């Protein structure tokens, strides 16, 4: 009886013994098969030969599977080659990305340091300007009735503001360059993320296992067994045909049965199989023993024809299933290759944009270096302005100390002049007294016209401040607290100068 083929390449458990008929163990004397039964067996055998289509299909499946095996090997090789190339190019891209990021971070750090130094310089300048702003010019230096003014009122602040505006423009340009570079990096990162995602999905779909070799082995086993089964059916048909030939009236009965099939039965064509005349057959008659042996084998095989046909179809169905699995696997490999090729296409696009990303880094660095030079120049000017204001404030304190020194000098001169006048006045009084005493002692004896100046008073001396030709006034008088504060600041400056 037929059994479904469960193991790959398993041999059929259904066989028709007419392939190489073994000698029967015993024979039944007088075994005969009715002509009607022989005709039925022949027609059934002829119908079974239509199963040759399953064998043809089996051969087609095996050929297709072999082609699929070759195609799968090519697809896997191409996919692995692309994946290997993508992997290496990804490493190169990541190195370039690291370099670009270094340029960006280095520029940011340098920019931050420059801004820090600039802020510090501006803060120092502003502090100095605030000191000028808070230092009021002593009223003693200014015309009477003038509104109070600070030191900053006597200098032009527009230069500082213009310098600050220029620095703001430079900083804005640097930020724009940084933003443009940052946008380029974000685009680069987006490209790399897309590549990583696509490549990750591509590798996830990749599998080194292929079911095709095992399936092909099974398919070849089925095809070989089906060919063997078909050969058995063909031998059985030949045996049936031989039995008809050696049975009187067999040809006529076959033609009649083929021409008038029972209702629902599949028509069978026997043209080309049966000769037109039994008399045309010139064959040696069978011995009784050969006839009985033939009928015994025929009867046994006829009972298994339907099972053999069923097994052929079962094997074909299993082959179709495995063939579908093979085609699905090849389709999966093709899809995987297409996806990998798509990733590679994306990679090509990234490499087309790569020079732009690299040039963005070079442009950012060049622009920043140029801007940094201008910022440093402006920063030096700020520092120069601060030093000018510092010297201005220091000079004002020096002016106060100088005025104080002059005041002290004038006071000393005035004191000396006062003391001198006191001595001169004493000498004058003594001179007057001496002159009077002389006149009293000798005045009666000396003629008046002998020395007309004998009666003159002594000359008088006077010490006074001589104003200059331009009518300059005396040194202004400063409050002691003002002088003290200036002296304190000046001493602090000298101390800081020695420390530095």
UniProtKB/Swiss-Prot annotation:
Q: Name one GO biological process term.
A: autophagy of mitochondrion
Entry GO CC:
Atg1/ULK1 kinase complex; phagophore assembly site membrane
Q: Where is the composition biased (Basic and acidic residues)?
A: 481-490
A single MF term (Gene Ontology): molecular adaptor activity
Q: Which domain of life is it from?
A: Eukaryota
Where are the annotated coiled coils located?
157-181, 292-322
Is DNA-binding there in the keyword field?
A: no
Keywords from the named record: Autophagy, Coiled coil, Cytoplasm, Membrane
Purpose of the protein: Autophagy-specific protein that functions in response to autophagy-inducing signals as a scaffold to recruit other ATG proteins to organize pre-autophagosomal structure (PAS) formation. Modulates the timing and magnitude of the autophagy response, such as the size of the sequestering vesicles. Plays particularly a role in pexophagy and nucleophagy.
Q: Which family does it belong to?
A: Belongs to the ATG17 family.
Q: What is this protein called?
A: Autophagy-related protein 17
Organism classification, top ranks? Eukaryota, Fungi, Dikarya, Ascomycota, Pezizomycotina
Its gene name is atg17
């Amino acid at each position: 009886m037929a059994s479904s083929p469960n193991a790959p390449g398993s041999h059929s458990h259904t066989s028709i013994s007419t392939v190489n008929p073994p000698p029967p163990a015993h024979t039944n004397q007088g075994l005969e098969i009715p002509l009607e039964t022989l005709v039925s067996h022949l027609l059934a055998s002829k119908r079974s030969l239509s199963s040759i289509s399953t064998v043809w299909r089996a051969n087609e499946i095996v050929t297709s599977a072999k082609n699929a095996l070759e195609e799968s090997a090519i697809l896997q090789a191409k996919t692995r080659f692309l994946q290997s190339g993508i992997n290496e190019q990804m490493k190169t891209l990541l190195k370039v990305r690291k370099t670009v990021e270094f340029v960006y971070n280095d520029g940011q750090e340098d920019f931050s340091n420059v801004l820090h130094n600039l802020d510090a310089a501006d803060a120092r300048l502003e502090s100095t300007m605030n000191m000028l702003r808070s230092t009021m010019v002593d009223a003693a230096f200014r015309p009477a009735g003038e509104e109070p003014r600070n030191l900053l009122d006597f200098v032009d602040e527009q230069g500082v503001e213009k310098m600050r505006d220029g620095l703001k423009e430079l900083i804005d340009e640097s930020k724009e360059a940084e933003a443009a570079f940052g946008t380029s990096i974000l685009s680069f990162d987006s490209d790399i993320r897309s590549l990583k995602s696509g490549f990750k999905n591509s590798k996830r779909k990749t599998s080194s296992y292929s079911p095709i070799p095992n399936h092909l082995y099974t398919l070849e086993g089925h095809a070989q067994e089906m060919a063997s089964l078909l050969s058995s059916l063909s031998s059985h048909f030949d045996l049936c045909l031989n039995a008809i030939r050696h049975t009187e009236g067999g040809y006529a009965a076959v033609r009649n049965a083929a021409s008038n099939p029972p209702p629902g039965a599949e028509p069978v064509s026997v043209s080309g199989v049966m000769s037109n005349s039994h008399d045309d057959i010139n064959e040696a008659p069978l011995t009784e023993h050969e006839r009985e042996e033939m009928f015994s084998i025929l009867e046994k095989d006829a009972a298994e024809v339907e099972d053999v046909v069923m097994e052929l179809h079962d094997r074909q169905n299993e082959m179709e299933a495995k063939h579908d699995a093979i085609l699905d696997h090849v389709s999966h490999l093709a899809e995987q290759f297409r996806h990998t090729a798509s990733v590679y296409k994306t990679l090509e696009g990234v490499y087309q944009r790569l020079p732009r990303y690299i040039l963005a880094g070079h442009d950012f660095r060049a622009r920043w270096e140029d801007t940094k030079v201008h910022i440093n120049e402006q920063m030096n000017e700020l520092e120069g302005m601060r030093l000018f204001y510092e010297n201005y404030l220091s000079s004002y304190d020096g002016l106060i100390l100088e005025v104080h020194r002059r005041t002290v000098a004038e006071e000393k001169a005035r004191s000396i002049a006062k003391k001198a006048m006191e001595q001169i006045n004493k000498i004058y009084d003594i001179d007057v007294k001496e002159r009077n005493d002389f006149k009293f002692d000798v005045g009666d004896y000396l003629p008046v016209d002998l020395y007309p100046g004998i009666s003159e008073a002594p000359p008088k001396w006077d010490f006074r401040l001589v104003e200059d030709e331009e009518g300059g006034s005396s040194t202004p008088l400063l409050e002691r607290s003002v002088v003290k504060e200036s002296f304190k600041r000046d001493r602090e400056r000298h101390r800081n100068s020695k420390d530095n």
